[in-house]
Amino acid sequence: MKSINAYTDGSCLGNPGPGGWAVLLRYKNNEKELVGGELDTTNNRMELMAAIMALERLSEPCQIKLHTDSQYVRQGITEWMSGWVRRGWKTAAGDPVKNRDLWERLCAATQRHMVEWCWVKAHNGDSDNERVDVLARGQAMAQRSTVASR
């Protein structure tokens, strides 16, 4: 089973507003960047999309160390999801879980991989985290330009 390091980040200008996500996948000396964006989204949705794309783009089951600066993503998948599912996708307060569509997609994407969820502090000198931050922000800005040109 291949060992992959993934760095993910999401960005949103306005929250809600134009947003972008970015992934850096590293296997041995090989790297691949993945990016995308949406016209009207939130930061949390872009953080989730980055993690989803990191996992979905792997063509075979892998051991993956997924680095995110989003506690929302890390805690959601490692701590909160089992309770949400048990309560029929309701929070502990009884409210519907936000971004359920993406949480379900992320859960499905994890099934064929061995994932270690690693939190990294944002804007704290981690060069790979900074790299995906710049890429995600660039995608959000590109989406904003698309909106402005309409």
Swiss-Prot record:
An example of a GO molecular function for this protein is: RNA-DNA hybrid ribonuclease activity
Documented EC number(s): 3.1.26.4
Q: Which cofactors is this protein said to need?
A: Mg(2+)
According to the lineage, what is the superkingdom? Bacteria
One GO cellular component term of this record is: cytoplasm
Pfam families according to UniProt: RNase_H
Chemical reaction(s) catalysed = Endonucleolytic cleavage to 5'-phosphomonoester
Q: Where does Mg(2+) 1 bind?
A: 9, 47, 69
GO terms in the biological process aspect are: DNA replication, removal of RNA primer
Q: What is its main location?
A: cytoplasm
The record's remark on the cofactor is: Binds 1 Mg(2+) ion per subunit. May bind a second metal ion at a regulatory site, or after substrate binding.
Q: What does this protein do?
A: Endonuclease that specifically degrades the RNA of RNA-DNA hybrids.
The similarity comment for this entry is: Belongs to the RNase H family.
The name this protein carries in UniProt is Ribonuclease HI
